[in-house]
């Protein structure tokens, strides 16, 4: 897995972002989506690296050479999901039609009354989980790397002051301690398992025709605290429609110590396999706009590098 995502920086300004979000709430979601078209066209034309990454991914997921319209749909899906996040942060759930698949898996995990890891990816919307949370009384603390999305986070936190309490910043000295604490208190923690900080342990797994590297830390955390892992993705289907999918991919309680490494590898491969399945099902929902298969390692802040290494060793 490439570490290039750590070098990606936001474009634009906080003022511009606040202006767009404010206008969206003024005119409503339908009109706001129309406003996204010129913005998407601009970024598609002038963001060369992102466009190249989009084309490479879509060629794998679609099984053919993507057309310009495919690239545009990819950018527009990303912009729509980003816009919808702000409506969800303001509890505007009535704007969306959400279907849930794997309700039995979700309900079984809730009935146990224990903490659980929700392992997602930059595929679709994790925020749409808030809509399901109203029915299931589900609150999830999200583990995020915040340094390359400061403007978005600033605007989001201003809209929903309770949001910072549900975010665990990745790459800090106390990151994993907070994760352990939440899980030990039987809370749910969401982690995106398709990115890793430099220095973190990774293992290869087949993904869309080529091996990619994925982090092992979620599985080590689950083993340490004997908590299950559910794969979760919230796919955007167009219009106001989303689908939430839940699948159990790892049961840490049943793994003997001597079999841990093999169990981690199997679970990681299962994660990569389910991620590939949903990428093919909804290819325009893939929001990693960099070369995912490039194993290059750009420089990473020292605190993130050291912290991730310590976190991995603590879980072995």
Where are these regions (language model features)?
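Membrane-anchoring hydrophobic helices of lipid-metabolizing enzymes
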Residues: 1-120, 155-157, 162-164
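Soluble or luminal CAZymes and related metallo-dependent hydrolases
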Residues: 15, 50, 98, 171, ...
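Catalytic core of membrane glycerolipid acyltransferases/transacylases, capturing the structured
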Residues: 66-67, 80, 112-172, 185, ...
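A conditional alpha-helix N-cap/helix-loop micro-motif detector
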Residues: 96-100, 149, 169-173, 211-212, ...
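Conserved beta-strand termini and adjacent loop/short-helix elements that scaffold enzyme active sites
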Residues: 101-103, 143-145, 170-172, 247-249, ...
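Short amphipathic alpha-helical segments and helix-helix/interface helices
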Residues: 106-107, 130, 156-157, 179-180, ...
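Non-catalytic C-terminal accessory region of glycerolipid acyltransferases
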Residues: 110, 135, 173-316
């Amino acid at each position: 897995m490439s570490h290039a995502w750590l070098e990606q920086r936001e474009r634009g300004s906080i003022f511009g972002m606040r202006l767009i979000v404010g206008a969206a709430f003024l005119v409503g979601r339908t009109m706001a989506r129309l406003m996204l078209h010129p913005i998407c066209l601009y970024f598609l034309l002038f963001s060369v690296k992102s466009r190249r990454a989009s084309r490479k991914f879509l060629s794998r997921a679609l099984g053919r050479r993507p057309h310009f319209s495919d690239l545009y749909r990819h950018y527009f899906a990303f912009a729509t999901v980003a816009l919808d996040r702000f409506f969800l942060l303001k509890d505007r759930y009535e704007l969306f039609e959400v279907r849930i698949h794997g309700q039995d898996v979700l309900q079984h995990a809730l009935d146990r009354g224990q903490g659980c890891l929700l392992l997602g990816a930059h595929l679709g919307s994790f925020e749409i989980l808030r809509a399901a949370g109203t029915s299931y009384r589900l609150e999830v603390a999200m583990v995020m790397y915040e340094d390359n999305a400061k403007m978005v986070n600033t605007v989001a936190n201003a809209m929903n002051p309770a949001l910072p309490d549900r975010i665990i910043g990745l790459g800090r000295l106390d990151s994993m301690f907070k994760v352990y604490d939440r899980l030990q208190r039987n809370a749910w923690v969401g982690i995106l398992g398709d990115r890793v900080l430099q220095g973190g342990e990774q293992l290869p797994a087949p993904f869309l025709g080529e091996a990619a590297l994925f982090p092992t830390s979620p599985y080590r955390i689950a083993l340490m605290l004997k908590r299950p892992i559910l794969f979760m993705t919230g796919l955007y289907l167009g219009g106001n429609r989303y689908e939430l999918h839940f699948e159990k991919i790892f049961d840490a309680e049943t793994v003997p110590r001597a079999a841990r490494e093999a169990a981690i590898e199997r679970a990681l491969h299962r994660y990569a396999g389910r991620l590939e399945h949903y990428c093919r099902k909804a290819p325009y929902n893939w929001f990693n706009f960099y070369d995912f298969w490039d194993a290059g390692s750009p420089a990473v802040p020292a605190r993130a590098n050291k912290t991730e290494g310590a976190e991995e060793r603590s879980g072995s």
